[in-house]
Swiss-Prot record:
Domain SIS residue range list: 55-218
Active site residues of this protein: 83, 114
SUPFAM superfamilies in alphabetical order: SIS domain
A Gene Ontology molecular function term of the record: carbon-oxygen lyase activity
Catalysed reactions, semicolon-separated: N-acetyl-D-muramate 6-phosphate + H2O = N-acetyl-D-glucosamine 6-phosphate + (R)-lactate
Protein name: N-acetylmuramic acid 6-phosphate etherase
Native organism: Cronobacter sakazakii (strain ATCC BAA-894)
InterPro entries xrefs: Etherase_MurQ, Glucokinase_regulatory_CS, MURQ/GCKR, SIS_dom, SIS_dom_sf
The protein's assembly and partners: Homodimer.
Function: Specifically catalyzes the cleavage of the D-lactyl ether substituent of MurNAc 6-phosphate, producing GlcNAc 6-phosphate and D-lactate. Together with AnmK, is also required for the utilization of anhydro-N-acetylmuramic acid (anhMurNAc) either imported from the medium or derived from its own cell wall murein, and thus plays a role in cell wall recycling.
EC number(s) per entry: 4.2.1.126
Amino acid sequence: MNLGSLVSETRNPDTLDLDALPTLEMLRRFNEEDKRVAYAVSETLPEVAKAVDAAAAALTRGGRLIYMGAGTSGRLGVLDASECPPTFGVPHGVVVGLIAGGPGALLKAVEGAEDNAQLGEDDLKAIGLNARDMVVGLAASGRTPYVIGGLKYARALGCATAAISCNPGSPIAEAAEIAISPVVGPEALTGSTRLKSGTAQKFVLNMISTGAMVKCGKVYQNLMVDMKATNVKLVDRACRMVMEATGVTREEAEAVLTQTEYEVKPAILMVLTGLDAQAAHARLAAHNGFLRAALQP
């Protein structure tokens, strides 16, 4: 396998003098390269949309959204998964991040783990993967055996699958139903895919998880109304969301939130409809948690 032929491994002609540049000019070069990321991701939006719809469908049928990757890619998946419970109020374990080598690999590289295709399958078996789930494989190179092994196993079970890589026509793209390949070009630091490639993957993960949660009723307007108010900052945000969605004062927002144990969706519904807390919860349940639908007469 000629890894040197991968776009992500080639040398960038615009940064050949990186080690001779003054600090500010070096940072300008980094910044110019970073500007390419958003455009590269924009070219993949039709495929990202398919992944969002597939993820939302998996969550709606009681399945999970599972990310898997090695190194930087794996860490990005774990990061995105860990943000979903506080942001969208989903239970831990609904969005899962797997990294080659296990949790210890988040802090220290586990040598050889990414080269083991069987390990990818084994990690999915260990969490009880089933056909209701969706698996998203991440690898900047697009050829990580751990991810390929996992995707092949997931497809054999009938899971929805997507692959995110930064090299076109990659093996993981071929292993998944949905291929998302933002080609960001050579890195400023040759082969350091934690730079543009990592940023592109994070952009895509942000869209997949956020988009899926919007489609699952976790958002009203552009407010994260299923957020868990677990600290002072988030309690304040809950108050502001109720105020912004309904026009009430802070005191009124706080009063209604105390009746819902600081759950924002029923609080908004109570203010806008006059329902009590119990009835607001019941109406939300009848509309599968979609606040906009619950507000319709």
